[in-house]
Structure formats: C-alpha cells, structure tokens
Amino acid sequence: MAREREQRHEREDRDNTFVDKLVHINRVAKVVKGGRRFGFAALVVVGDQKGRVGFGHGKAREVPEAIRKATESAKRALIRVPLREGRTLHHDVHGHHGAGKVILRAAPAGTGIIAGGPMRAVFETLGMHDVVAKSFGSSNPYNMVRATFDALKNQDSPRSVAARRGIKVSQLQSRRRVEDAEATD
C-alpha cells in the first residue's frame, strides 16, 4: 500500500516539474537544561507555473533539511488557481490572515509582477505574469503568504460564476461588454 502511494507520488513528480522558491528562513532556539539548541525554520512556495501553487513550513536542526521538509509540505498543499488568459487574475480580490491584508488586482498584458517579497514568490511559482499587489498591516512573511493564498482562494472563474447563477459563460461575458461600453460613453 505504501509502495503504491510512493510510486504515485513519483509519477506525479515526473509529470509536473515544480519550481520552488525559498521565501524566508528563520533561526529558532529551544531552551533546554544545558542551554539553547538552535534550529532553523523555512517557508517555501512551490508551483508548476501553470496555475497550481502551494506553500509549506519546515523545521529542522540544519537549513537544507528544513528546506526539504518545507518543500514536501508545500507539494502536499497545492491549490489550483484559475488564471485569465494564463497570465493574470479574473478580477480584483482581497485576502487577510492575522494582521496581514493584501489586495490583488488584475493587470493588462505587459504590466509584469508588481508585488513585494513573499507575494512575488507566490506569483512567480504560480505562473502569473501580470498582477498588481499591495500588502497592508503585518509584513511577517508567513502572514503575507497566507493572506495571498486567502485572496487567491477567494477568486472565482467566469465558469464557476456562470454555474452558480445558472447561465452560460457567454451570457456573463456579453453583460460585461455591455457594461464596459456604457462606462465609456
């Protein structure tokens, strides 16, 4: 049973080439009777640059081991994010975690990734090419990454919106064109 699971994971790894980015590494200390024991905590973001991304946290006595654990954790926590034209968001979204808040805005082609630190790593591994992001409140990398994931999970694709409303995607997009035409007049 365990062997089948390992083989399935190996197949998935061969099919999907993942890009991983180290977001943050932190030295932590455990106080014991004889003094302090130092270790490391790593935050890693992993994605296939085709709309799947995940983040993981790993702790160990050595940095490479902490990074390996974080990468494995991130691969187990992948989410799929719908992208418009494979490059940007479908609509503007907000997300928060703890005291960290983020606003993600869809951007026209050629804009690039305008985002700070931890958010940039998420977008690059996700495969997003055009996005404008702003963070407020906490600048803690863990909170920023979790807030970014919260925002990405809040995004709806036109297909899911149309299904929820009980209409076709073409009807949804034709309404958008009419609204855009009225706004320019």
Swiss-Prot record:
Record-linked Pfam families: Ribosomal_S5, Ribosomal_S5_C
GO cellular component: small ribosomal subunit
Keywords annotated in UniProt: Ribonucleoprotein, Ribosomal protein, RNA-binding, rRNA-binding
GO biological process, alphabetically ordered: translation
Task performed by this protein: With S4 and S12 plays an important role in translational accuracy.
Subunit architecture: Part of the 30S ribosomal subunit. Contacts proteins S4 and S8.
Family affiliation: Belongs to the universal ribosomal protein uS5 family.
InterPro entries per record: Ribosomal_Su5_D2-typ_SF (IPR020568), Ribosomal_uS5 (IPR000851), Ribosomal_uS5_bac-type (IPR005712), Ribosomal_uS5_C (IPR005324), Ribosomal_uS5_N (IPR013810), Ribosomal_uS5_N_CS (IPR018192), Ribsml_uS5_D2-typ_fold_subgr (IPR014721)
Gene: rpsE
Name of the protein described by the UniProt record: Small ribosomal subunit protein uS5
Free-text comment about domains: The N-terminal domain interacts with the head of the 30S subunit; the C-terminal domain interacts with the body and contacts protein S4. The interaction surface between S4 and S5 is involved in control of translational fidelity.
Region Disordered: start-end pairs: 157-185
